[in-house]
C-alpha cells in the first residue's frame, strides 16, 4: 500500500512535466486583451498548448490600434512598473487568473511568458528602444526573481499552467555591443560578459532558484539570447533542474520573413537573400534552414538534453511572402524530424494580421477590423489558403 501511495504521489508531482514527455504542437497568443473564445477555437484546430503573453492587456486600445500616445507609459502588466517591482498588481492578476480559468474550462494548456521584467521593459512599450538596465545592474536580476517567485506561488497549482517562460526574447547582447550573429564571434563576446549582469545564465539561475522555493514542479522554459536566436545556444548553460525546457525562436532569414507592404516584397522562399551587416548573399532552402538550427541540435547533443526538452517556441513569416507555405512546411518538417516541440506565431492575433494565417494571402476586410476593435471574432471566410493547410496538416494528431 505504501509503495502504491508513493507511486501516486510521484505521478501527481510530475504531472505538469509529463505533458512534455511527447512532442507537443502549439501556438502563441499575444493579444490586446483576454480573448477566452480563442482557446476553444485553438482546441478545435488540434492546438495542444498556448504560449500566452498578457503584457498588452495593460494598454489602451487607442494606443495599440490607432497610433495614439500611450496614456500609461509607466504601467506594466503584473509587475506594475518596470522601473521598480513592488509586488504583483492585484487587478492584473485577477484578469490573468480569469483567463487561465477560461483556458482550463476549454481544455487548453498554457505556457505563461512575459514581455517585460523589472529593468527590461518591452521595446515596443519603450518608445521602440531597448531597455537594457537589467543587463547592467544585478539589482534588477533580484527584482525579476522576486516577481517570478510571487507569481509562481500563486499559479503553482493552476491546472492549465504547464510552463513558466521566464522572459520573451532576452537580449543581453544589445547592451554590450553584440548585434549580428552572422558576422560577430559569440565565444569572444560571451567571455567578455560572463559573470556580469549581462550574463543571461546568471539571470536564469537567480530566477529559477527563487521559483523553486515555492514551486518545485512546474516546468520552467528559458529562451536563448539575442531575441531567442538558435545561435545564442552557443553560450547557454543547462540549468541544474530536471524540470527545465530550452527554447528558441525562428524567423530567419529575418530579411525574408519580416517583409511587408511598406518594405516591399523583394525576396521569396526558397531563394537567395542578403543577410547580416555585410549583406552577404546566401541561398535559403530547407537544407539551409536546418543548417541554421544546427547550434541547437549540437548543444543538445553535447549536454545530453533530450529532444522533448527543446521547444521551437515561435516561428513564422509574413503570410504575404511568396513561398510562405513552403517555408512553414520545411520548418515543421525539420522540427518534427528532431522531435522538438513547436508553436507557430500566431493564432488570431488581434493587433496585427501579418501572421494570421487563416487569412491566407488576402488583405483583411473592413468587417474584420471592425470586429477586432470591438473585441469580437472577425468573420472568417474560406479562402484558397496553402499556408493554413500546411499548419493544419502539421497539427494533425498522429495516433
Task: Describe every region a protein language model picked out.
Residues 68-70, 128-131, 182, 237-240, ...:
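Short, hinge-like loop/turn segments at secondary-structure boundaries
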Residues 322-399:
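Aromatic-rich peripheral "rim/lid" segments of glycoside hydrolase catalytic domains that contact
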Amino acid at each position: 500500500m505504501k509503495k502504491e501511495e508513493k507511486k501516486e504521489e510521484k505521478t501527481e508531482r510530475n504531472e505538469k512535466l509529463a505533458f512534455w514527455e511527447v512532442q507537443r504542437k502549439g501556438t502563441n497568443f499575444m493579444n490586446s486583451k483576454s480573448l477566452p473564445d480563442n482557446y476553444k477555437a485553438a482546441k478545435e484546430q488540434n492546438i495542444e498548448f498556448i504560449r500566452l503573453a498578457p503584457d498588452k492587456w495593460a494598454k489602451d486600445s487607442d494606443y495599440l490600434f490607432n497610433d495614439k500616445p500611450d496614456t500609461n507609459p509607466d504601467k506594466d502588466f503584473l509587475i506594475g512598473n518596470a522601473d521598480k517591482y513592488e509586488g504583483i498588481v492585484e487587478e492584473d492578476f485577477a484578469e490573468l487568473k480569469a483567463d487561465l480559468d477560461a483556458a482550463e474550462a476549454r481544455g487548453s494548456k498554457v505556457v505563461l511568458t512575459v514581455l517585460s521584467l523589472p529593468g527590461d521593459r518591452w521595446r515596443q512599450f519603450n518608445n521602440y528602444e531597448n531597455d537594457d538596465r537589467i543587463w547592467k545592474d544585478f539589482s534588477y536580476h533580484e527584482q525579476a526573481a522576486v516577481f517570478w517567485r510571487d507569481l509562481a506561488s500563486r499559479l503553482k497549482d493552476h491546472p492549465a499552467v504547464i510552463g513558466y517562460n521566464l522572459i520573451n526574447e532576452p537580449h543581453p547582447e544589445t547592451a554590450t555591443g553584440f548585434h549580428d550573429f552572422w558576422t560577430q564571434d559569440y565565444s569572444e563576446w560571451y567571455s567578455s560578459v560572463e559573470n556580469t549582469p549581462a550574463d543571461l545564465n546568471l539571470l536564469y539561475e537567480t530566477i529559477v532558484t527563487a521559483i523553486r522555493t515555492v514551486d518545485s514542479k512546474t516546468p520552467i522554459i528559458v529562451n536563448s539570447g539575442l531575441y531567442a536566436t538558435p545561435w545564442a545556444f552557443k553560450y547557454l548553460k543547462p540549468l541544474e533542474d530536471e524540470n527545465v525546457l530550452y527554447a528558441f525562436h525562428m524567423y530567419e532569414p529575418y530579411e525574408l520573413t519580416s517583409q511587408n507592404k511598406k518594405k516591399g516584397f523583394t525576396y521569396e522562399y526558397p531563394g537567395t537573400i542578403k543577410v547580416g551587416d555585410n549583406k552577404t548573399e546566401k541561398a535559403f532552402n530547407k537544407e539551409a534552414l536546418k543548417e541554421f538550427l544546427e547550434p541547437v541540435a549540437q548543444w543538445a547533443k553535447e549536454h545530453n538534453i533530450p529532444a522533448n526538452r527543446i521547444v521551437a517556441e515561435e516561428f513564422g513569416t509574413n503570410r504575404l511572402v511568396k513561398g510562405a507555405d513552403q517555408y512553414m512546411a520545411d520548418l515543421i518538417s525539420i522540427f518534427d524530424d528532431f522531435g522538438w516541440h513547436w508553436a507557430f506565431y500566431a493564432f488570431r492575433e488581434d493587433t496585427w494580421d501579418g501572421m494570421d494565417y487563416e487569412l491566407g494571402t488576402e488583405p483583411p476586410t473592413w468587417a474584420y477590423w471592425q470586429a477586432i476593435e470591438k473585441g469580437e471574432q472577425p468573420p472568417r471566410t474560406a479562402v484558397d489558403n496553402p499556408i493554413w493547410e500546411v499548419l493544419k496538416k502539421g497539427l494533425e494528431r498522429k495516433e
